[in-house]
């Protein structure tokens, strides 16, 4: 591996390997870990779940003897989120540093990575039943207007389109307003993460072909059967669809919502390509917010 540009000094105490889906992040991170004595912290919103293997590209053999963290840490009964990730990633980072190894964050979930790099203030906020009762009956537009009155940043703008998430955002904004010292307490206990950030990128047409070939390989290896098995274990179609992409389209295909295998493969392929574009957009936004990404064109 060519590490000529990789200069880890006192300025950096960790590495981030990011990129769109199918850019080879895990393989690259494993190579770095072997060269630099590192351990990998996964930043993938679905690889945290046990049982989501083929659909998430969770190839544990690829890690070899390189230690990895935040993979297979919870079951599908639980909704894992960015707050959980930030806390778990902090713990993994400190554990790795205590053992004098190099933490390497690797993944494509931009929200998760951004929460570490730009230090989102994610505070444990209890439910406010009184506030929820006062807002009951308001429609989405009214809740959005109410939220904007707090004048606080929204890290994930899709939360504005979901009633439950928007209600939670209002709850958090109200808590911060009434507990102004909460963020200071959080920041005082936050580990000092100063990563060198490496971004992997392929030309568009090559990336699309990599996505296509990988999808066909996953289907051949049993991704449809994996999804069917999860449903037989008791997980609803709705839960599987909520996981997005591979599990969403495969669940729809198994239910007969997608009529043919050809339509299933084509629809899923196009959705993954669109997802890759959204990931690239997220990383560009991170750069606009001052995050320095060292891009490696593959």
UniProtKB/Swiss-Prot annotation:
The keyword Transferase applies. One of its GO terms (molecular function) is tRNA dimethylallyltransferase activity. Residues 44-47 are annotated as: Interaction with substrate tRNA. It comes from the Bacteria. Its cofactor is Mg(2+). It catalyses: adenosine(37) in tRNA + dimethylallyl diphosphate = N(6)-dimethylallyladenosine(37) in tRNA + diphosphate. ATP binds at residues 19-26. The record marks 109 as: Interaction with substrate tRNA. It holds the Pfam family IPPT. Keywords: ATP-binding, Magnesium, Nucleotide-binding, Transferase, tRNA processing. It is an enzyme of class 2 (transferase). Substrate binds at residues 21-26. GO terms for biological process: tRNA modification. The keyword Magnesium applies. SUPFAM superfamilies: P-loop containing nucleoside triphosphate hydrolases. Its EC number is 2.5.1.75. Coiled coil: none annotated. Catalyzes the transfer of a dimethylallyl group onto the adenine at position 37 in tRNAs that read codons beginning with uridine, leading to the formation of N6-(dimethylallyl)adenosine (i(6)A). Belongs to the IPP transferase family. Monomer. This is tRNA dimethylallyltransferase 2.
């Amino acid at each position: 591996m060519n590490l000529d540009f990789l200069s880890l000094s006192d300025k950096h105490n960790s590495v981030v390997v990011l990129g769109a889906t199918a850019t080879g992040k895990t393989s690259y991170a494993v190579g770095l870990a072997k060269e630099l004595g590192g351990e990998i912290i996964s930043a993938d919103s679905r690889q945290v779940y046990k049982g989501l293997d083929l659909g998430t590209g969770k190839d544990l053999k690829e890690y070899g003897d390189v230690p990895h963290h935040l993979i297979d840490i919870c079951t599908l009964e639980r909704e894992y989120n960015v707050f959980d990730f930030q806390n778990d990633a902090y713990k993994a980072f400190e554990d790795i540093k205590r053992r004098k190894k190099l933490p390497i964050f690797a993944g494509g979930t931009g929200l998760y990575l951004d929460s570490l790099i730009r230090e989102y203030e994610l505070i444990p906020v209890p439910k406010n039943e009184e506030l929820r009762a006062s807002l009951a009956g308001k429609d989405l537009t009214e809740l959005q207007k109410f939220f904007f009155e707090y004048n606080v940043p929204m890290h994930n703008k899709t939360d504005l389109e979901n009633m439950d998430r928007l209600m939670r955002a209002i709850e958090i904004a109200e808590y911060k307003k009434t507990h102004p010292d909460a963020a200071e307490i959080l920041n005082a206990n936050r580990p000092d993460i100063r990563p060198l950030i490496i971004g992997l990128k392929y030309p568009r047409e090559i990336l699309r072909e990599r996505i296509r070939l990988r999808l066909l390989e996953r289907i051949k290896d049993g991704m449809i059967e994996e999804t069917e098995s999860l449903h037989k274990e008791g997980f609803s179609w709705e839960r599987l669809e909520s996981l997005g992409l591979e599990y969403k389209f495969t669940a729809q295909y198994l239910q007969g919502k997608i009529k043919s295998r050809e339509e299933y493969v084509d629809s899923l392929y196009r959705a993954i390509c669109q997802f890759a574009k959204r990931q690239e957009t997220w990383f560009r936004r991170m750069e606009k917010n001052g995050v320095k990404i060292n891009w490696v064109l593959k």
